[in-house]
Amino acid sequence: STQAKTLFPYTTLFRSWLPSFIRSWTPGVYTELYHSLKTGKLVEQRVLSGPFWLNLQNGGTIGSYIEASVQNLEEPFNPVGIRISPGMFKYTRAGFMLENDPSAKYYVSANYEWGGYYNGHLTYMELSSRIAPIPHINLGVSYQQNQFDGVGDLRGKKQVNLIQFDSRFALNPRLQLIGFYQKNTSDALNSLNLRLAWEYQPLSYVYLVFNQSDFMGSDLTKQKVQTFLTKLSYLKQF
């Protein structure tokens, strides 16, 4: 597919009537268009508007948004095991979010969305936090809840909860261990990713990557796959 994006310049407003804890008000509109290379038909269109978007003096953000979507599925789509047959779908969603300064030692954010989703409805909530007590350590945790109602060919209901943990430990800027763990509490499916990155000389790296993930097989039984990857890159500068 081809992709076209349009970002209308966000208007940054500084006004004396804004409360002192608000740095600026930045409303804007963002659009995306995707077309099929085979047929030239529109595959996906998104228009996202953030009329109420406030940047705070402490580096945080409070915002609300509305998103209108058009999805033209050319093949069946199966999010979280829910089958959606090909067709044209139009729906609108709304949401709000708030966060403190992402660069702060302690970071917290919240996001809540509701509205249409293909031929049904989806309510989404995410809470996340991160702590970076020293530059060498970064730890994060998040919780997501997805409630599907009337989505898919069977028009059923399903709730999917995800718990995620991520970490970064750096002995120095050249040697880092990065980890990610996700648990799907609804289907008891887990995934783990560990990556060791070592820059043994400028712009030359050694990567060691371990992946383990659970998935539901075609026979609806829980299955597991493990992979281990190594990568060596070398750059000689003249």
Which ranges hold each PLM region?
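Short, small-residue-biased leader/transition segments that mark boundaries at the very start
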Residues: T2, T6-L13
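Exposed, low-structure sequence patches enriched in small/polar residues
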Residues: F14-F238
